[in-house]
UniProtKB/Swiss-Prot annotation:
Record flagged with keyword Cytoplasm: yes
Similarity section: Belongs to the JUPITER family.
Phosphothreonine carried by residues: T54
Gene this chain is encoded by: Jpt1
Expression sites by tissue: Expressed in yolk sac, fetal brain, brain, spleen and bone marrow.
Pfam family, one: JUPITER
Organism: Mus musculus
Record protein name field: Jupiter microtubule associated homolog 1
Family matches, as InterPro entries: JUPITER
Length: 154
C-alpha cells in the first residue's frame, strides 16, 4: 500500500494540505532547472524607453539611415527606408518622377501645411437639424439592392 505524503502550507499551525502554497525559498515556484540570476540584465537599447526625449549617443543603424546621412561612404546610395517610401508614393499615383526626390518632399510638406492652415481657418458648419417630415411610405413590393427581383414567373 502506498502512502501519500502531505505537506504543510506556509503556516506550520495550519491544517494538512496536499498542495504547496509557496516554495520554501519564497517567490516563484517556476523553475527551469538551473540557477537564475537575482537581477534581470538591464538592456541598453529599449525600443520605447525614450521616444521624444534626447537622442541616444549610439542610435541603431536603421535610425542613422532613415535620418540624416552619415559622413560615411554611403552618401551616394539611397537608404532602404527612402526606397520603400518611393515605392509607396509611386503606387499611390502622387509621385511619378524619381529624379526630383528632394524637391518633391519639400513640395508635399508645404502643400500639406497649406491645406492644414486652410482647414483650420474654415468654420465648421453646424449639423443640419432634421425637420419633422414624415418618412416616405414603404412600397408594398420591395426590390433587392441589385434591382432585380428573385420572383420567378412562368
Amino acid at each position: 500500500m502506498t502512502t501519500t505524503t502531505t505537506f504543510k502550507g506556509v503556516d506550520p499551525n495550519s491544517r494538512n494540505s496536499s498542495r504547496v502554497l509557496r516554495p520554501p525559498g519564497g517567490g516563484s515556484n517556476f523553475s527551469l532547472g538551473f540557477d537564475e540570476p537575482a537581477e534581470q540584465p538591464v538592456r541598453k537599447n529599449k525600443m520605447a524607453s525614450n521616444i521624444f526625449g534626447t537622442p541616444e549617443e549610439n542610435p541603431p543603424s536603421w535610425a542613422k539611415s532613415a535620418g540624416s546621412k552619415s559622413s560615411g561612404g554611403r552618401e551616394d546610395s539611397e537608404s532602404p527606408g527612402t526606397q520603400r517610401s518611393n515605392s509607396s508614393e509611386a503606387s499611390s499615383g502622387d509621385f511619378l518622377d524619381l529624379k526630383g526626390e528632394g524637391d518633391m518632399h519639400e513640395n508635399v510638406d508645404t502643400d500639406f501645411q497649406a491645406n492644414l492652415a486652410q482647414m483650420e481657418e474654415k468654420p465648421v458648419p453646424a449639423a443640419p437639424v432634421p425637420s419633422p417630415v414624415a418618412p416616405a411610405p414603404v412600397p408594398s413590393r420591395r426590390n433587392p439592392p441589385g434591382g432585380k427581383s428573385s420572383l420567378v414567373l412562368g
